[in-house]
Amino acid sequence: MESFGARLHRVVGERGPLCVGIDPHPGLLERWGLDDDVRGLERFAGTVVEALGDRVAVVKPQSAFFERFGSRGVAVLESTIRQLRTAGSLVLLDVKRGDIGSTVAAYASAYLDPSSPLHVDAVTVSPYLGVGALAPMFELAAAQGGGVFVLALTSNPEGAAVQRARTADGRTVAQLVIDEISQLNAGARPLGSVGLVVGATIGQTGHELAAVNGPLLAPGLGAQGASAADLRVVFGSSLPAVLPTYSREVLAAGPDVVALRGAADRVLADCRAALTGS
């Protein structure tokens, strides 16, 4: 079975280094002329799939914006996942789950077991209960060719108080996470399947990312304030592993399908230039 890291490397090579979020928050639905209800949600998600599913490497639905409509919203999420995967995009579900024991194993099954209606290519997780507590996620991902992205240095300013705090051995909390994920990915080729979330807004990290040997998801671009040029400052020698992530900057171009594609093409060109220096 092809690993997630290998699939991601292949699809990014084919489609380019870009992840686009599906974040149907009320203000964006209104901007698109849609009602803030399940019908509006379904039309929004369907339009994004039509516009980008066959051309963007990774699409990242934010689960909360579907969950807020209850079971009908989750049904739309399930349908969106199926459509995206059929169109050839890798689906990264933004859920930021984190727990222990049988509970984290249940989360793993919900998102990474092929028999689940919410089965996706990868998920985001929180390491606050300890990176080791996420072992069921890592194990099922490895068994099923899935991926996991662990929060490390996030784009929100509140995160620094925890992530840059020092542990007993002098490392920051973020560095501890980085080191443990580096061990999980050791020896993987062409890329490990456990990635990190590192915000594009944070400037020079002061942390060593080159040894991670896994994908580095970079949110915070566009509406959150970072530009593609900031990627070189944040990631330095780790640029080849970076997966830039845009949401509102692309989605604001909707609901016109052609305009959405044009917005995605523009930010992809910016990302290529930033990551390659050309």
Swiss-Prot record:
CDD domains on file: OMP_decarboxylase_like (cd04725)
Keyword Lyase among record annotations: yes
Key words of the record: Decarboxylase, Lyase, Pyrimidine biosynthesis
Active site, per annotation: K96 (proton donor)
Source organism, top-level taxon: Bacteria
Enzyme Commission code: 4.1.1.23
Coiled coil segments of this chain: none
BP GO annotations: 'de novo' pyrimidine nucleobase biosynthetic process; 'de novo' UMP biosynthetic process
Record-level Gene Ontology MF annotations: orotidine-5'-phosphate decarboxylase activity
This protein's pathway: Pyrimidine metabolism; UMP biosynthesis via de novo pathway; UMP from orotate: step 2/2
Catalytic reaction annotation: orotidine 5'-phosphate + H(+) = UMP + CO2
TM ranges: none
Alphabetical list of Gene3D superfamilies matching this protein: Aldolase class I (3.20.20.70)
Keyword DNA repair: no
Family: Belongs to the OMP decarboxylase family. Type 2 subfamily.
Listed PANTHER family: OROTIDINE 5'-PHOSPHATE DECARBOXYLASE
Protein name: Orotidine 5'-phosphate decarboxylase
Native organism: Salinispora tropica (strain ATCC BAA-916 / DSM 44818 / JCM 13857 / NBRC 105044 / CNB-440)
Gene that this polypeptide is encoded by: pyrF
